[in-house]
Amino acid sequence: MAQRGKAVKTSVRKFKINDLDQVLGMAEKYASWDATATKADIGEFYSSSPEFFFVAEADKKILGFVCGRESNPPAETLNKWKSRKVASIETLAVDKDYRRHGIATSLLSALFEAFKQKKIDLVTLSVPVVEIAAMKMYGKLGFEPRAQFLWKRLDS
């Protein structure tokens, strides 16, 4: 376990298929999805956008991962957004014992560089409202709120 605020020596690299089990374990524990992650989910992220899938590791242990995907909004949406190419952050997870050590920021920096190489000029993401720390981090990185996703149960 890392001490809070103390730097952790990590390296960020592209995901490799032999990372699957460690990434799956991390996704099951820490990713904010409505359904439990499966090997098929992680495999699909990799097969659809391998250039946008990164892991952070220290001593051969994966401490976090991020995967993104190029989006294809209609031309009208691109015009409204004043954008040429859009991508989304599909998921980001960091082991809870290693949070607040810059790992998420390092992962996102690698992802943003990969996006820039593909001439992507706008990045979107969804964050559950309960993920307050994530919202703060994204705000510090320059993300701005654009919409809110709401729901109401009709069965009660």
Predicted segments — roles?
Residues 9-23:
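A short beta-loop-alpha structural element at the N-terminal edge
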Residues 24-37:
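Helix-loop element at the rim of GNAT/NAT acetyltransferase active sites that forms part
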Residues 34-55, 67:
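Active-site rim helix/loop that mediates acceptor-substrate recognition in acyltransferases
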Residues 55, 61-70, 88, 93:
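Conserved beta-strand in the GNAT
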Residues 94, 100-113, 136-140:
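Conserved acetyl-CoA-binding loop-helix of GNAT-fold acetyltransferases
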Residues 115-127:
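Conserved GNAT acetyl-CoA-binding A-motif
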Residues 124-134, 151-155:
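Conserved beta-strand-loop-alpha-helix junction that forms the acyl-donor binding cleft
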